Swiss-Prot record:
It comes from the Bacteria. GO terms for molecular function: fructose 1,6-bisphosphate 1-phosphatase activity; magnesium ion binding. This is Fructose-1,6-bisphosphatase class 1. It holds the Pfam family FBPase.
Amino acid sequence: MSNLITIERHILEQQKFFPEAHGELTDLLTDVAFAAKLVRREVVRAGLVDILGLAGSTNVQGEEVKKLDLFANEQIISAIGAHGRFAVMGSEENEEIIIPTNNESGNYVLLFDPLDGSSNIDVNVSVGTIFSIYKLKTSDPAKASLADCLQAGSEQVAAGYVIYGSSVVMVYTTGHGVHGFTYDPTIGEFLLSDENITTPKRGKYYSMNEGSYAQFNEGTKRYLDYIKTEDKATNRPYSTRYIGSLVADFHRNLLTGGIFIYPPTGKHPNGKLRLMYEANPLAFICEQAGGRATNGKERILDIKPTELHQRTPLYIGSTDDVMVAEEFEQGKR
């Protein structure tokens, strides 16, 4: 039998890159993996219990909340917050920051999207959890505040996501490569399946919702015309691959190459995706895998956030593809 490496073992081995660490980050990532198992348990049997459909409320984004959204949010807060390792947390589903109980010894910040792509739950399309970890800036954990959450993405110490699909996959980085794990339900463990993931420099797929084409700016329209025009030298035309679940679309492009685009529109001039919960963690992962992520004008990880639920346009994926998209957005083509 091949040497099976669990995510817990792999995380422990990653400690060698942090000689000053005392195992805290290892415990945090292990907690996240445990929370993912709890969410996975309910996602796979959502159709058998009364957890599908709408909860009859809206979140801070003004979106209708799914029952499974609420469950995932509650499970993550409960499973992770109870240990006191995080001084402060932020969730896409909560308007304000979350101060966990016993946070006096917490030295980290957790920001997360409990269930990305939740509009797909009822039709059995892949959904996922996205998370981001930062060091606490405040010297006293008991005084952790919103300011500790509003850090640039370049300050992340770890980020990752979990996809609940035909198989359950967890991908994470601590700034030393990107690693993927597949959940084995027979033993209840995430096992290493993809070590040191690298994304192709150029792909042949693009992922975006073209339903808002009439509201796209001229740069976006010209870029779409460009990637649909035949040119063998640049592997065009590109093919569309779009699920409507950010984490699933991103994961596919990470492995196969390509670009995910959520541009500004007339209705959403500042974009629609959340900087802190979606763009930053995925940008960190993408760059660690050799890719690129921008808002069309600025590197995502350099953006200085001013709001917990700040939105941003997003161009993320293979470096060459993103750079070309930027040139169109900036009027250079």
